[in-house]
Amino acid sequence: MKAKGELKEYEVIGRKLPSESEPKPPLYKMRIFSPDQIVAKSRFWYFLRQLKKFKKTTGEIVSIREIPEKSPVKIKNFGIWLRYESRSGVHNMYREYRDLSVGGAVTQCYRDMGARHRARAHSIQIIKVEVIKASACRRPQVKQFHNSTIRFPLPKRVHHHKRLNTFAYKRPSTYFL
């Protein structure tokens, strides 16, 4: 899988094709994070082939839909449990991110795993994604934003065009630290 662009959350439901021995096969539902529906279907079959003894040729997808974010304007803390294959073996990991949507947090996770651990998108498997309370956060990079009196520096100021001359004899200085 290529984790291109912002990843979206899809709910994919599939089953084995009905047969004489099994007229009503059970349904299997998964939450898949992918850039589009085609990749979501592909990942569904990949995971199902690992878990159950059937594949795309002996099964069918009943439904696929994109899960919309419940509150896309409220920032949330996300806990992500994942498994990834590195050059030295398979590792389990828990990571925390702050974002507006689940898809945004998972996209951040894929980018972060690629940067910090050189993990490719196809070798990362998201086990669980959960919204966590501020009191339950463990990672300092997430906890630093829970301060109500947090202040951000303004490292670069932009000159307003009203006060600028038409011609200048030197380049403007925008750094005031």
UniProtKB/Swiss-Prot annotation:
GO biological process: translation
Gene3D superfamilies: 3.10.20.10
Protein's UniProt keywords contain Lyase: no
Record's keyword terms, sorted: Ribonucleoprotein, Ribosomal protein
Organism superkingdom: Eukaryota
An example Gene Ontology CC term for this record: ribosome
GO molecular function: structural constituent of ribosome
PANTHER family, alphabetized: 60S RIBOSOMAL PROTEIN L18A (PTHR10052)
Family from the record: Belongs to the eukaryotic ribosomal protein eL20 family.
Name under which the protein is recorded: Large ribosomal subunit protein eL20
